[in-house]
Structures are given as C-alpha cells and as structure tokens.
Amino acid sequence: MTATYMNSSVPFMYDSYPAVAPERFQGQLQGKTAIVTGGSSGIGRAVCKAFASAGASVACIARREPRLKTLVDEIKAEGGKAIPLAVDISEKDAAKKIVSQVEAELGPVDILVNVAGIARLGPLVDEPEDLDIWWKVHEVNVRAPALLTRAVLPSMIERKSGAVISVSSVVATWPSPIQTAYASSKAAISKFHESLAAELEGTGVLSFALNPGSVESELGAPDDAINTASQHPMLEKMRQMLKSPRKKQTAQLPADVCVALVCDPRCKVLNGRHVEAAQDLSPVLEEAEKEGGGRIGKDRLYLVNIGIL
C-alpha cells in the first residue's frame, strides 16, 4: 500500500514491494558474512532473516540469548546459516570480541548492520545532573556502532568490498522536544555515515544510514526509556501517540531495503545518504542517477543538512 510522505511525490510504502522484494536478491550473498545487532526482536530480527534469505551467513547479536537461539533455529529451518551471540554491545571491548568470534566461526565480515538502539523521553532540564542515562543513549546508538564499524573496516578495506548500515530515525532531521538524547544520537549516526562514505571513497566499502519508518518495536520498553519523574506535558502526549492505533511500517520493509542497499549495484549512488525505507527506492534512484545527482545532489537531499541564506 502506498501514500504520500512529507509532501513528497515519491510513494510512501508500508510493506515490502517489488523493487526490494526478497526474491530479487535470493542467494546473491552466498559466501558473505553479516553481523546484525539488535537481532532478538523487531527490525533487527527481520534484518537477520532477510540477509539469511539472501544467502549470507548471519551473526545475530543481542542480549537475550533464548530469543536469539529461537531466531537462529528458524533461519536454519529455512535453509539459512546463522549463529547467536548474546552480547551487550555497550560493554567495553564488545566490538572486538564480536568481530573476533564471527571471523573465527563464519569468516571475514562483509556486512555490518547496526540496528540495536535505545531511547530516552523527557526534557533535558528534568534529567539527573550527571546525565548518565542521557549519555547511555549515545553509548548504545553512536559509540557502539562506531566501535563495531572500526573493528570491521580494516578487513573490508583490504578486500575492497563491504557495507555498513546503521538504523537512524526521522528525528535526526526534525525538531523533537523531549528527545534531546535520542534525536541527537540519530543525527550523529546519520552524519557519521555521510562522513564515513567520504573518507572511504574509492575503497569499495559502502556506508548508509537508514530511517526505518514507523515500525512497532521495543525501543521504548526499558524502564528508563521514559523519565517518569518529569511532569512535562509532552510526555503524556508522547505516551498517547505511541499507543495510538495508527498504521505503521512492517519490520520486513526496512529489512528488505537493507538487503537491497547491499545487493543492488544501483544503490551505490546513495552511498553516505540518510535513506528513507518508507519511500519507494525506484524514483529515488532514478533521480540520484541523473547528472550531478539531480535534485538529490543539487539540494543535498537525504542528508542531515543545515541550509543558509
């Protein structure tokens, strides 16, 4: 089903569609190894299954081992290859340990998808003065993906091939009250990928940030995701919005877009961009392939951008 998005003429998608359909890329990643964080639920779980369906050997990373084992059993039952690694990615040396174990069991890493993330809702003025919980959002949403990226890059650069994708959010580009931690972390990860793509130019390694759309997830599930000590009126509005029965994107949609970004050679023109999973990729690619990148290049679209007079 399609609709419009932010007054854009590009169709707005809620589920997988022909341009990113799994059957397009089935088996294309045979012999490739992928690491996916946040694999025990939601988008991360769907991404693990999508890359396995495309033929990759997948290291499924999350904290909840029973859920990971169930996921890996499902992947194997469907003919795929996967291993579970129960790790808290925010822990010291987690990235090195993950990459070392994956390389030992599955081989060199070709694809990294950073899905794991946490949120924090509440006004900055009501946060504890040490901002420890606030900074934890950046530890998980920015530092951990950066460390994992740093750990996989040397091998990718040496082999002149690879792709790193991190899940960002629409709040990276919109003013988002009571989300200073989450919004700034997502703006940071989108800018991280833009800068990374520039410094990796010519290496064969691709870099993308991805706004998955409005997908049902456990992002706000932890007890400290909402600052319950705050009485800010926006908190109640946010609670009601999160509970509202509005139509959302399926987890399969961003998962399939991740695979398309890696498998479809046309997607190289979006290297370094903040890709919108809920937009039909076909017209976006057509515009990006025009001389100078069309409007996307001229107006610096799909980037965390500050315009000036």
Curated annotation (Swiss-Prot):
Family: Belongs to the short-chain dehydrogenases/reductases (SDR) family.
Name of a matching Pfam family: adh_short
Name of the protein this chain belongs to: Short chain dehydrogenase MYCFIDRAFT_6125
Species classification: Eukaryota, Fungi, Dikarya, Ascomycota, Pezizomycotina
Protein EC: 1.1.1.-
Active-site annotation: 168, 182, 186
GO cellular component: membrane
Function: Short chain dehydrogenase; part of the gene cluster that mediates the biosynthesis of an emodin derivative that may be involved in black Sigatoka disease of banana. The pathway begins with the synthesis of atrochrysone thioester by the polyketide synthase PKS8-1. The atrochrysone carboxyl ACP thioesterase MYCFIDRAFT_190111 then breaks the thioester bond and releases the atrochrysone carboxylic acid from PKS8-1.
Residues that bind NADP(+): 43, 67, 88, 150, 182, 186, 215, 217
An MF annotation (GO) of this entry: oxidoreductase activity
